Amino acid sequence: MTRTAIEIPENVSAEVSNLALTVEGPNGSVTRTLWYPSVTVSVDEDADADAVVIETDETDAKTSATVGTFESHVSNMIHGVTDGWSYEMEVYYAHFPMQVSVEGDEVIIENFLGEKASRRTPIRGDTNVQIDGEMVTLTGPSKEDVGQTAADIEQLTRVTDKDTRIFQDGVYITQKPQQGGA
């Protein structure tokens, strides 16, 4: 039997309903479905401290690994609603000055390599995009949404059919959240 308890800080609340865990805190809320056969996720409201409990009766390696994965997901959710996740990106161009802007729930890149048409990608979830000159900062409570938005922006400016040693224009991730949840 494998059992793991992740303590919930005072300013954070957690709730499980229909296999979905919702964690709410000062920076917003994150909901994620945590389902695997014979693995249960529950909120233990003990007198000392609340905790998210992940447990299973199985002893095989795959189920134990899933418990560890769920533990990481819950820790990331708690970190996201308390401190948030942040990515930093840098706009780099040598040939044509490109403009990056936010319009509604889309990031728009204009004049990339002199193109007439603008390139667009959606902003995922509750991700907040701030543009300050050549720096783009993405923040939000969901690690997956912030990371995928950063990856989408980076892929949007991928150079194809040209020598990438010469054409290095693009928007590149310069700083990611460090492993270990910080």
UniProtKB/Swiss-Prot annotation:
GO biological process: cytoplasmic translation
Gene3D superfamilies, alphabetized: Ribosomal protein L6, alpha-beta domain (3.90.930.12)
InterPro entries, per the entry: Ribosomal_uL6-like, Ribosomal_uL6-like_a/b-dom_sf, Ribosomal_uL6_a/b-dom, Ribosomal_uL6_arc, Ribosomal_uL6_CS2
MF (Gene Ontology): rRNA binding; structural constituent of ribosome
Secretion signal span: none
GO-annotated cellular components: cytosolic large ribosomal subunit
Keywords: Ribonucleoprotein, Ribosomal protein, RNA-binding, rRNA-binding
Subunit comment: Part of the 50S ribosomal subunit.
Function field: This protein binds to the 23S rRNA, and is important in its secondary structure. It is located near the subunit interface in the base of the L7/L12 stalk, and near the tRNA binding site of the peptidyltransferase center.
Family that this chain belongs to: Belongs to the universal ribosomal protein uL6 family.
Name of the molecule in the record: Large ribosomal subunit protein uL6
Annotated source species: Haloquadratum walsbyi (strain DSM 16790 / HBSQ001)
